């Protein structure tokens, strides 16, 4: 029911994008539209245009946000909160970095080239946060995933999570109870 426009298209006029997405909603193929990977000014401009032309507006924003990646706090989150746009961030566990005890290497941490691209450059700076999450998890006898997701759930509508094991789903559910 929510169609998420994945990434801002710099080669297509914004008016054409909004017209096309509005047609998707009016045709009943989706109830709502959301967007991912854009700047706050782009979201504001698109929704202003949609409002002025009686079109569907973006009702959710899927940005890169977690305890390590917090750039969204600068402009996007305040904007979305002021406009009542749902926040549905991706990579809530930083590609597994906020889920694994420091020093433990998993297959995903070794092989996920996209996450390496996002996090390897700042690994030394991020380690302090990862260590703090580990200490809090140990202190409260919960998993690092639970601590990381519990923090995020105080900030956003619904994080987009991915799992490879059944027990990871349990940790995600338990995070709602912290």
Name each model-derived stretch.
Residues 1-71, 75:
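Glycine/proline-rich, positively charged
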Residues 25, 92, 121-178:
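Conserved short secondary-structure transition element at the edge of the structured enzyme core
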Residues 13, 33, 61, 80, ...:
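Conserved, mostly hydrophobic/aromatic
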Residues 81-136, 155-157:
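Glycine-rich, positively charged active-site loop/lid region within alpha/beta enzyme cores that binds
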């Amino acid at each position: 029911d929510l169609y998420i426009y994945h990434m801002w298209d710099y080669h297509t006029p914004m008016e054409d994008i909004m017209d096309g997405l509005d047609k998707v909603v009016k045709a009943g193929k989706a109830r709502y539209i959301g967007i991912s990977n854009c700047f706050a000014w782009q979201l504001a401009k698109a929704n202003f245009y949609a409002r002025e032309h009686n079109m569907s507006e973006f009702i959710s924003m899927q940005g890169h946000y977690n305890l390590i990646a917090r750039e969204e706090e600068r402009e996007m989150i305040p904007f979305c909160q002021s406009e009542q746009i749902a926040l549905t961030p991706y990579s809530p566990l930083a590609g597994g970095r906020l889920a694994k005890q420091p020093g433990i290497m998993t297959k995903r941490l070794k092989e996920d080239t996209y996450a390496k691209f996002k996090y390897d450059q700042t690994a030394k700076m991020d380690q302090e946060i990862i260590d703090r999450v580990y200490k809090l998890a140990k202190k409260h006898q919960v998993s690092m995933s639970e601590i990381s997701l519990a923090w995020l759930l105080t900030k956003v509508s619904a994080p987009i999570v991915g799992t490879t094991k059944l027990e990871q789903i349990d940790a995600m559910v338990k995070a709602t109870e912290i």
